[in-house]
Every structure is written in C-alpha cells, then in structure tokens.
Amino acid sequence: MKAVWQGWWRRGRVVARSLQGPVRSPAGLGEPRFRTFDEPLAWVIVALLTIGLVMVYSASIAYADADRATHSRFYYLIRHALSLGVALGAGWCVFRVPTRIWQRWAPKIFLLAIVLLALVLVPGIGKVVNGSRRWISLGFMNLQPSELMKLAVVVYAADFTSRKAVYLQGFFLESLWKGFVPMAGAIVLVGGLLLAEPDFGAFAVVAVIAMATLFLGGINGRIFFGLLIIGAVAAVGLVVSSPYRMERVVGFLDPWQDPYGKGYQLSHSLIAFGRGEWFGVGLGQSVEKLFYLPEAHTDFLMAVIGEEFGFAGIATVVGLFAWLVWRAFHIGRESRKLERHFQALAAQAIGIWIGWQCFINIGVNLGLLPTKGLTLPLLSYGGSAILANCMALAILLRIDWENRLLMRGYKV
C-alpha cells in the first residue's frame, strides 16, 4: 500500500508540473509544444460551477434571511462555497489517481456504495428529511449515498462491460447469461435500496447509466431492445403502484387544474419562465423565489435562472452542458482509438450521467416531465451532488490527460 501511495504522489508531481504550462513532447527536437490537459473543458466546468454559486445565492437569499436559525442571508452561499471547496479538493486528489487504479478498484467501490445505501435505511443512521431517508449525518455535513452511487455505477459498469465484451458481443444466450444477467442483478439490488428510501429519480439515472454503458459496449441488440421494453413497463408499474408518484403525474399533465395543490411547484416554475421572457428581469430580481417556488435553490434552480436571465440565460447554460457532454463522448472516442476500453466507456458514461440528469431536471422545470427530486448537476445546492460531479469530471480530465500523453509516446 505504501508503494502505491508513493507512486500516486510521484505522478501527482508530474501532473502539477504539467499544469503549470506547456511541455515538450518526448522527442523534444523541434516538435510543437502542447498542453497536457483539456483547458476548454476545465474552463466550461469552472463556468458552470461559478454560475451555480451565484444562482444558489440569488435563489436562497430569501429563505436564509427569513430563517432565524441561519442567522445570515449568506447561509446557503457559505455552505455551498464550502461544499464546492471540498469537492474541488477531492477532484484534485481524484485527478492524480491513474485510471487503471479506478478500474482495478471498481468492484470494491461499487460494493462500498451499496453498503452506504443500506446504512441509510438503518434507523439511527439514516436521516429523514421531507419524508425520505436519503442522508447519513457526518456531523459537519450530510452525506447522500445515492449521489456517490452514480459515480460508483459509472466505474463499475465501465469495468464490467470492458471485461465482458467478448460475451456481450457474442451469441444471444452467451450475451444474456454471462453479460446482461450479472449487471441486471446488481442494478436491481441498487434499485431496491434506492426505492426503499425512496429515491426514484436517482434510480432512473443509475439505470440509464448502466443500460447505456452496456449498449456502448456492444451488447446483443435483441437483449437491449428487450431491456428497453422491460424498463418502460417497470417504470409505469412503479408509478401506478405509488399514490404519491401518481399524484405527481396527474399534476404534471395539467398543473393549472390544481395550482394550489398537486400542480403548485410546476405552475410557479412556468410562471417564472414566463416572467423571464428573452433576457430576464435581472440578477436578484426574481419574484418566484420569494417563497412562491419551493426548492428554488435545488431542484428548481433553472426556473430562477429563466426568470432572472430569460431565454438567453437558459440557452447559455444548456449550451455549456451540451458542449460538456459532447466533449465527454469525444474523449471516449479518442480512448477507444488507443484501445483503452475502460477509459472510453467511463468517459462516455460520465457524459450520459450529466446529460441525462440535466435533461430530467430541465424537463421537470419546463413541465415536460413529472416532478422528480433531481438537482441540476454542478449548479444546484447540495454538497454530495457537487462532490460526486467534481470527482466524475476529474476522472474525465484524467482520461483525456492520459490520452494526450500516450499519443505522444509517454507511459501512464
């Protein structure tokens, strides 16, 4: 173990030197200079985190100012900034770890995430908020294991798919029993733990990450098509079997039928977008965040962005996310060219995670999807979510960093 940590430390020093500026290729004989990390991707991540910090303060100031327990209108801003600092520090540590280590430890990471999900359900350990048992209190912060499970599924699904590629791409029965069934069993276990909290939104994200990774790994087409049908039927069954979820669907179909009951959140979200028009009412000038729109600084942050910055602000945020997802898939394609199959799948799975969760959150805010308890990645208030997002993007940056060095003759 000591030797492993020493190896990571030495590699970390190389990373630190490379981040200070351009370096020369191995030959060093008149070849062009190059940078060893993806600067545009890093700046897009910084831009999204900065937008999130500003908008969390804007959306939460009324809540913090009215709550005597917080003693400050900067309460949520300070907590979000501290969470962001911890997340960036964790991201830096993750960036220094070679991706082969993540692949080697993927099953253990996945198992640890399952244990944390199980601990949430234990009375006295799991913390109940708004009727859901999703958090573990650590004293200085509340840890939400479902957010860490998303990262665990990314590395585990990428590792599993890269190891089982021969079976996944083989005959139907071989692909089914040796490729699909083990992964399906793991996701069903995770789904049972998440639905027990309950956290249907996190389960939807985890299931899509796993399914999409199997698809990218070349799973038999008939199995994947059957999986889509089974997934759709299961989703409908979960909604119909829960009166709470049915109420959300009914409120989603016509929020104006009961604007003070089932459709309250969605109706006020739509009002916020309507007030924003093209360029918004200005930073800090939102009316809906003044106790009209619940969860304005978490699940419905995009509605506040729409009200204060209008269509232009929404288009900017969506454009940044779209570029980030495209870049993740591009890094995955570059990894595949280098025959780094785990890294390729992990990069694209991170892109799927960010893109799919953004799609659900923005769709809910716009009334295109039923209300879910999912935050907007990198922007919404929430320490565990920011931590998991920054760690995932650090892995993405590390994959790209290793690709660049390999293409120029370095070993990683």
Curated annotation (Swiss-Prot):
Residues that span the membrane, as ranges: 41-61, 74-94, 109-129, 135-155, 176-196, 200-220, 223-243, 304-324, 349-369, 376-396
Catalytic activity: [GlcNAc-(1->4)-Mur2Ac(oyl-L-Ala-gamma-D-Glu-L-Lys-D-Ala-D-Ala)](n)-di-trans,octa-cis-undecaprenyl diphosphate + beta-D-GlcNAc-(1->4)-Mur2Ac(oyl-L-Ala-gamma-D-Glu-L-Lys-D-Ala-D-Ala)-di-trans,octa-cis-undecaprenyl diphosphate = [GlcNAc-(1->4)-Mur2Ac(oyl-L-Ala-gamma-D-Glu-L-Lys-D-Ala-D-Ala)](n+1)-di-trans,octa-cis-undecaprenyl diphosphate + di-trans,octa-cis-undecaprenyl diphosphate + H(+)
Pathway it works in: Cell wall biogenesis; peptidoglycan biosynthesis
Main location: membrane
Database matches in InterPro entries: Cell_cycle_FtsW-rel_CS, FtsW, FtsW/RodA
Record localization: Cell inner membrane
Source superkingdom: Bacteria
Pfam families assigned to the protein according to its UniProt record, in alphabetical order: FTSW_RODA_SPOVE (PF01098)
GO cellular component: cell division site; plasma membrane
Cytoplasmic-side segments: 1-40, 95-108, 156-175, 221-222, 325-348, 397-412
UniProt keywords, alphabetically: Cell cycle, Cell division, Cell inner membrane, Cell membrane, Cell shape, Cell wall biogenesis/degradation, Glycosyltransferase, Membrane, Peptidoglycan synthesis, Transferase, Transmembrane, Transmembrane helix
UniProt EC number: 2.4.99.28
GO biological process: cell wall organization; FtsZ-dependent cytokinesis; peptidoglycan biosynthetic process; regulation of cell shape
MF GO annotations: lipid-linked peptidoglycan transporter activity; peptidoglycan glycosyltransferase activity
Membrane topology of this protein: Multi-pass membrane protein
Periplasmic compartment residues: 62-73, 130-134, 197-199, 244-303, 370-375
Entry-linked HAMAP family: PGT_FtsW_proteobact
Family to which the UniProt record says this protein belongs: Belongs to the SEDS family. FtsW subfamily.
Function: Peptidoglycan polymerase that is essential for cell division.
Protein name: Probable peptidoglycan glycosyltransferase FtsW
Gene, per the UniProt record: ftsW
